[in-house]
């Protein structure tokens, strides 16, 4: 989708956080039948998120990992299984864990566990964002058309500046991926940005962490 964007806003407004959506071990396991449909090169796009994670750490930008997880009796799936997805991300499956090796996930990192598509729904995500004094959400992960999109919309409706790193998200299909990017761009002009643009903005980002704001 990359093209010149007409936006009155900077890529990063105020204080940023990198939001890593649902990049879990399951995505890097080869199976004959996948519980969730994925577009081609899905795993390669997810692996690219490591570049953004490393740069965020280097620049003092907080990294927040989002993990989808469901109880083994399926009681919290709700209507989720009425669509194209099969049972996935169960608590007792080791592949439900964040892809620690691929992403350099650390025990000290921020982690939000969710039961539904949006990272905001039924979680303490917004409490964490307020504590970190975050203004801009830099989103990567999957699916573009599901959890990334729903999180973007809830962030938008909560008045956060929302950006999607195009190279580091992937959808259930190429068509769904592109449609979701267009839908998010409709909400905030300039929302969809390349990895290189985002890395450059991170490099120039002033560390406005709560600690520095108090100085």
List where the protein language model places each region.
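Active-site-adjacent betaalpha module
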Residues: 1-17, 54, 58-59, 82-215
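A short alpha/beta connector and helix-capping loop motif
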Residues: 14, 32-56, 60-68
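Short acidic, Gly/Ser-rich segments with clustered Asp/Glu that frequently serve as metal-coordination loops
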Residues: 24-30
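Active-site loop signature of alpha/beta-hydrolase-fold enzymes
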Residues: 26, 71-72, 171
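Early exported N-terminus immediately downstream of N-terminal targeting peptides
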Residues: 63, 67-86
